[in-house]
Amino acid sequence: KLDNFIFSSSCTVYGQADELPITENAPVKKAESPYGNSKQIGEEIIAESCKAHNFNAIALRYFNPIGAHKSIKIGELPLGVPQNLIPFVTQTAAGIRKELSVFGDDYPTKDGTVVRDYIHVVDLAKAHIAALKRLINKNNKQNFEFFNVGSGTGSSVLEVIKAFEKASGTSLNYKIV
């Protein structure tokens, strides 16, 4: 019998947010991608299953996971086709890519590049442990709950590039397109 379940969801369930920062009170809107849609459907199935089969679940709505554990057992691998900024950065630093394309410099941000909330994979693992403890200790307020998992602070693409360069001592070849 299943008593407790943790679902790895995504902030993409919010669609195009009305305001920032995005809180758990923000409405779930039409997803902008098949990935976001799959997370919305997953949450709906789990919520209905919790009611029908009397078990508890928490959906953790990840923002943008980055980084690696010092053991290198979890985290970014600069292989394959990247799906977000950090693998593009690491592939450029490793020489797999000649140049990093930065898409746009006309966003309403301090440097004109898009801003995202990033969460380190170790902090994400800690969120899973906290969610599991909440369920095991029966501290949940309802049988299906959801929590945003991010830093709560946004970083622009250029800020991420500059932070990577500083931390790694590597200069990245990038171009605004």
Residue ranges of predicted features:
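Catalytic helix-loop patch of NAD(P)-dependent Rossmann-fold dehydrogenases
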Residues: 4, 13-59, 64, 73-84
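Hydrophobic, Gly/Ser/Ala-rich alpha-helical and linker tracts in large acyl-processing enzymes
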Residues: 69-82, 89-92, 98
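Short aromatic-enriched loop/helix-cap "lid" or pocket-rim segments at secondary-structure transitions
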Residues: 18-20, 69-74, 114-115, 161
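C-terminal substrate-binding subdomain of Rossmann-fold SDR/epimerase-dehydratase oxidoreductases
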Residues: 86-177
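Active-site loop of short-chain dehydrogenase/reductase
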Residues: 1-5, 54-56, 99, 141-145
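Feature marks short, surface-exposed loop/turn motifs that line or immediately flank catalytic pockets
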Residues: 14, 66-69, 153-155
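Residue(s) in the substrate-gating loop at a strand-loop-helix junction
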Residues: 10
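Structural signature of the Rossmann-like NAD(P)-dependent dehydrogenase/reductase core
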Residues: 5-7, 58-61, 117, 148-150
